Each structure stands twice: as C-alpha cells, then as structure tokens.
Amino acid sequence: FRYRALSPKYNDVYINGAPMNDMESGQFRYSLVGGLNQQTRNVDFALPFENNNFSLTGMAGSNNYDFRAGSMAGGNRITLSGANRNYTLRGMYTYGSGFNSKGWAFATNITYRWANRGYVEGTFYNAFSYFFGVQKKWNNGHSLSFSTWGNPTERASQGASTDEVYWLVNDYQYNPYWGYQNGHRRNSRVVNDFAPAAIFTWDWNI
C-alpha cells in the first residue's frame, strides 16, 4: 500500500519516538520487527499533516511503535499458527509483567517461523525473532526503559519470469531461482538478514 502513491520513504516510522527509517534507502525495514506481533500492536498512526505527539508527520504519514516494557499487555501468551504462504508453521511465546509495586516492568517475546517449502516451489523460510524489554518508573514522573530485539532470517527468493516461460513449463508458480545440484535442491538467491537493534528511552512527564 502506498499512501497517495508516494514512495514508502515518505512514510516516517518511529520506535519510542526515535526515527527508524533506513539512512541509505530512506525506507523503514519491516524485517527489523518481523515476528514481533504483540509488540507492534502498540502503535500510533498519524495522517499527513495531522497533529501528533511524536513527529512532524511525513508526506505519507507517520507511525510510532511503543516498545516500552510497561506498555505491553500483561500475562503469558502462547500462539501456534499454520499457513500456506511464506512460512508453514509459527510458534510464539509472549510475556508481559506490567508494573509491579516497585515500579519495574518486564516483557519478552520469542517467535520461530519455518517452511521447508513456501507457496512457490524452491522457497524455504527459517526465521527466529526475539524481544526483551525492561522499564523502571519513579513517582516523580521519570521513567527509564531499555528494549532490544532482532530477527535473524534465512529465506529463499522467488524470481520473476515471462508469460512465455509460464506457458512452456505449464506452471504459473515457476521459480527460475531454484533447481537440483548434485541431487539436492538449491536456490541461487538465499537472503540472510539480521539487524539487531536496541533502544534506551528516558521519559519525563512534566
């Protein structure tokens, strides 16, 4: 989706109020938060030129994800999912403590997504996501929070082709990036991506 057909680089994305768009491409790398479904639920959206409390909104709008441990829903949550697209199975465990009597809050998330073969032939998916956050709040309005997360991923790609090729092989899911080498399946375009991140946030409610 492109708001007003503008490039995604005009959509400003923040985490705890800090800008997170890539400095080279200008776009936000959503693979940075892949698998963190419960964490990315805490988000504020702002339309272009709409007043908000975290940015001078971008031409294609702005999003601000709240990764503070105290903002996560309390309790334990276990999720098991099956799909027939990028991955086949997903397991997720999420924990949030909420603030205790001493003003501490903790949150964690572990997610694993796997596919031996995705929707398209020759594709596989192997991704592990983690999140850990801690926050301390004082009665004088000050709060300190630390969060770290990552999403190491190994996935095989799908290549584009032409109608003529699809007709010749009689398969509209034909993937030119894969084949057999020495009797084993091999994809020539395997993406390995891991960009660990951490953020330290000081809040002072005056």
Residue ranges, per PLM feature:
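Short, glycine-/polar-rich solvent-exposed loops and beta-turns at beta-strand/coil boundaries
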Residues: 1, 5, 55-58, 123-125
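Extracytoplasmic beta-strand/coil segments of soluble accessory domains associated
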Residues: 1-19
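Extracytoplasmic
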Residues: 8-10, 38-40, 58-60, 73-75, ...
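Short beta-strands and strand-coil junctions in structured, solvent-facing domains, enriched
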Residues: 10, 21-22, 50-53
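Short acidic/polar hinge/loop motifs at secondary-structure boundaries
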Residues: 18-47, 66-68, 72, 173
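Transmembrane beta-barrel wall of Gram-negative outer-membrane proteins
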Residues: 82-115, 119-158, 187-205
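Flexible, surface-exposed loop regions and adjacent strand-edge segments
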Residues: 124-129, 161-171
